[in-house]
Amino acid sequence: MSTTASPATTESLQVLGLVGNPAPSSRTARVTQHVVALVRDALGPTGTAGDIVELADHGGDPSVQVAVGDAHVLVVATPAYKGSYTGLLKLFLDTLAGDGLRETVVVPVVTAGSPVHATMTDLHLRWVLGELGGSLPVPSVVLTERDLKAREDVADAVGGWRDAHLAGVVAAVQAVASSRSTTRSANDQALAGTTSR
């Protein structure tokens, strides 16, 4: 089954990776880059070049909030830290409005030392992303130290998630793009009605 987006979609679909690891050039960042590329490629011609934002470098930059608001797909990545996501990521998420991820498909990525820490971190992260209005249509990309050591190539480590869930991400993005288009059209009509009075 193909996971490429329908050609009927003409809107440019924004894919953004958000890395909450304070360490530069981390494995978490490499996994994020790969997942962003997978989603972008699966969206076909409508998928724009996915950007990666490392919050350690840009967390205080207001343009990051704007980019998050514009994204159709947000890949949110964190290493497990004491059974939860990092304080760096929390600080950024706290700056978003209560519905700051509404009409955004969110793919969490968790890297952890053990399966227990991975599960706890994933639960905490998915909860807060859902509270912010994000759509979480598929399971997270969860990788342990053992997963990453057993497969030198990140593509191999993410392969199982890709095969099982990438099509679900694409379908959800199509629904979000349609919803955004409908909302924008309704807002434009309402604005036109107001200005014509």
Which residue ranges define each predicted feature?
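N-terminal beta1-alpha1-beta2 submodule of the flavodoxin-like/Rossmannoid cofactor-binding fold
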Residues: 1-98, 163, 170-173, 177, ...
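Residue-level preference for alpha-helix termini and adjacent loops
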Residues: 80, 84, 100, 140-142, ...
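Short, glycine-/small-residue-rich phosphate/pyrophosphate-handling segment
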Residues: 106-154, 160
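Short, amphipathic alpha-helical "lid/cap" segments that border enzyme active or binding sites
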Residues: 154-170
